[in-house]
Regions:
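Short helix-initiation/N-cap motifs at beta->coil->alpha
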Residues: 60-70, 166-172, 246-260
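Short, solvent-exposed loop/beta-turn-alpha elements that line the ligand-binding surface or hinge
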Residues: 105-120, 164, 206-231, 278-279, ...
Length: 322
């Protein structure tokens, strides 16, 4: 309910920053599909029904990559949407795009809209805030990496359905038992570079790039050949060869395989929950990202995922007034 309230507030805030004559359309491009796409459409309907001056028009523009690419092309062509949802991977690109965006904090303050960044977890607000303290975009669907498992499949394999694996050795052991019980896809992962590299490293209190993961300089280099990283990917490769781990593709290609019941375990985004809750026809459980218990400092914390709303520049001056 809190996320719904904040998202609706964002829509109202941005929608209030356009002229008040004839109904003005506010184009909102996003990458929310399935259950989350329905959620976005419902938010727009609620706002549109609350007044008659403005109309938010949500448009699904494909995956995060596709939506961002479309947004950049549209800006260059002079027909960018008013609002675009950009995943956290594209945050640095958007921050560096001077002249392409209008800081969300500025849009809201210019409109006389009171906005309190402390409504968010500090790490989330800080991620989208400039050094001068101004929020550049409005966090919409911040997420983190988590672990989902099929309780019914666990029971069939003789595993404790109320005791999800907490460590990677336990995951691989459970995957082997699921395979032995006849499951064709015991374990998979979505967003592999995020879940198995970025968050994996942070979860183990380990750097994955030089220059303090790039925060201390733009000449950073990946450092994913450490003993821990090599060990983990060797374990994944071994599991892949024996069929207990099934790679489903890049990005979120694996997402559908869990709620459908095809795969019994998956590491992915907390954002997948809405789809799992809506589509899964089996009992499921959720836990934290697995870790190697012998690594000092683990578990620690994971990387922020999800996306935020950016206001595009190039619109008529009056459209930014409330």
């Amino acid at each position: 309910m809190q996320l719904k309230k904040l998202a609706l507030t964002a829509a109202i805030a941005f929608g209030a920053c356009v002229p008040a004559h004839a109904q003005t359309e506010i184009q909102w491009w996003h990458s929310m599909s399935a259950a989350l796409g329905d959620w976005v459409n419902d938010l727009a309907k609620q706002y549109n029904a609350s007044q008659t001056k403005y109309k938010i028009v949500p448009t699904y523009k494909g995956t995060y990559d596709e939506s961002m690419t479309a947004g950049i092309a549209a800006f260059r062509a002079g027909n960018a949407p008013h609002i675009i949802q950009v995943f956290e991977v594209g945050t640095a690109t958007m921050m560096a795009s001077k002249g392409a965006i209008v800081p969300a904090g500025k849009v809201m303050s210019d409109a006389g809209f009171k906005f309190d960044p402390t409504s968010y977890v500090s790490a989330v607000a800080g991620y989208y805030t400039a050094p001068n303290g101004q929020m550049l975009s409005y966090p919409l669907n911040s997420s983190t990496t988590i672990f989902y498992y099929n309780k019914d499949a666990f029971k069939k394999a003789g595993l404790d359905a109320n005791k999800p694996p907490k460590t990677w050795p336990e995951v691989f052991e459970a995957a082997s038992k699921l395979k032995a019980s006849g499951h064709s896809c015991p374990f998979t992962t979505s967003w592999i570079s995020w879940t198995q590299l970025e968050s994996f490293s942070l979860w183990h209190n380990t750097l994955f790039a030089s220059k303090n993961n790039g925060f201390d300089g733009t000449d950073a280099q990946l450092q994913i050949n450490t003993p821990l990283h090599v060990r983990h990917f060797e374990n994944l490769a071994k599991a892949s060869k024996d069929g207990s781990f099934v790679y489903k593709g890049r990005g979120n290609a694996a997402d559908a395989s869990f709620p459908s019941g095809e795969c019994a375990m998956i590491t992915g985004s907390s954002g997948l929950y809405a789809r799992v809750a809506k589509e899964a026809k089996f009992a499921y459980g959720i836990s934290t990202l697995p870790y190697y218990a012998d690594v000092k400092g683990a578990p620690q914390n994971t990387a922020i995922g999800g996306a935020s709303l950016w206001v595009m520049a190039g619109k008529k001056p009056e459209e930014y007034k409330g």
